[in-house]
Design a protein with these regions (language model features):
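Short, Gly/Ser/Thr-enriched beta-strand-loop segments that form substrate-interacting elements
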Residues: 179-187
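Active-site-proximal beta-strand elements of phosphoester/diester hydrolases
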Residues: 201-205
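Active-site loop->helix "elbow" adjoining a glycine-rich segment at hydrolase catalytic centers
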Residues: 109-111, 118
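Active-site glycine-centered loops adjacent to acidic/histidine catalytic or metal-binding residues
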Residues: 108, 168, 207
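N-terminal beta1-alpha1 cap of cysteine-dependent amidohydrolase-like domains
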Residues: 1-105, 116-117, 123, 127-141, ...
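A glycine-rich beta-turn/hairpin centered on an aromatic-Pro dipeptide
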Residues: 165-169, 173
Length: 254
């Protein structure tokens, strides 16, 4: 880890919300670790939590259970666990983050949810559709991903071809409004999306939190934290507006 930011001081007052399930997993702890490595404080947001999003400087939508297909006009086609309460929470968080122009990073389910939020849809099971890629899950970066060089992700990864892991069985199908595809795998399944205007918004289909030993995947978090800091500085000069979702962010919600 030649670019290790271990010694980087914490950004004063920079708080990133991490939306996740009721119980944190290793993935969520690694996301927390990655954000703290780059100086951010974190607040874990469970389904149904009341959070004043205006007190956050950035939002991460983490991985987890499948988004209920009713969110994109379909009925369940696979046997899966759903968390409708979390779906509802993520809609509220994304809506308010969009209003406030707060940077958002979606990981796996989070990337899919961003696409659904923007009116897109999912393929509920890509496994039988794979031709040039492996069917089994890959925790190590053994999946080839092609990145659009002229994109935010391309700037972060610094290479048009990267290795990534794969722990998903669904994929983005119809692309949501004002989004662009910035990475695909060898079967052309979407691996990353970005906003085409305004708000810093990125969705990553793989799990970079498991690949922090790799500089490129680590930079995804550092660029996100930098975007949150930049937006915070701008917001300090803006008038404060109360939102309908205003609740609280615990001072020690790590």
């Amino acid at each position: 880890m030649s670019e290790s930011p271990v010694d980087k001081p914490e950004h004063p007052g920079l708080t990133i919300g991490i939306s996740g399930p009721a119980r944190r997993s290793l993935a969520h702890r690694l996301i927390t670790f990655a954000l703290r490595l780059h100086g951010a404080r974190t607040h874990f947001i469970r389904p149904g939590s009341k959070v004043d999003v205006s007190l956050l400087d950035g939002l991460v939508l983490s991985g987890g259970t499948h988004v209920h297909p009713s969110r994109y006009g379909q009925t369940p086609q696979v046997t899966a666990r759903y968390d409708v309460r979390r779906d509802e929470t993520d809609v509220r968080l994304l809506s308010r983050a969009e209003e406030l122009n707060i940077p958002v990073l979606g990981i796996c389910r989070g990337a899919q949810f961003i696409n659904i939020f923007r009116g897109g849809s999912l393929c509920q099971n890509v496994t039988p559709l794979r031709v040039n890629t492996r069917h089994r899950p890959l925790l190590l970066p053994l999946q080839t991903v092609r990145v659009v060089s002229d994109s935010r992700l391309g700037e972060v990864m610094r290479s048009p071809v990267i290795g990534a892991n794969r722990i998903h069985s669904q994929s983005i199908k119809k692309l949501g409004t004002h989004l662009r595809v910035v990475a695909v795998d060898n079967d052309s399944f979407v691996q990353a999306i970005e906003n085409t205007r305004g708000q810093w918004l990125m969705g990553i289909q793989w799990h970079p939190e498991y690949l922090l030993y790799h500089g490129g995947h680590r930079r995804i978090f550092s660029h996100f934290v930098q975007a949150a800091e930049d937006r915070k500085l701008v917001r300090l000069d803006e008038p404060v507006e109360a939102g309908e979702d205003d609740g609280y962010v615990a001072q020690n919600g790590r």
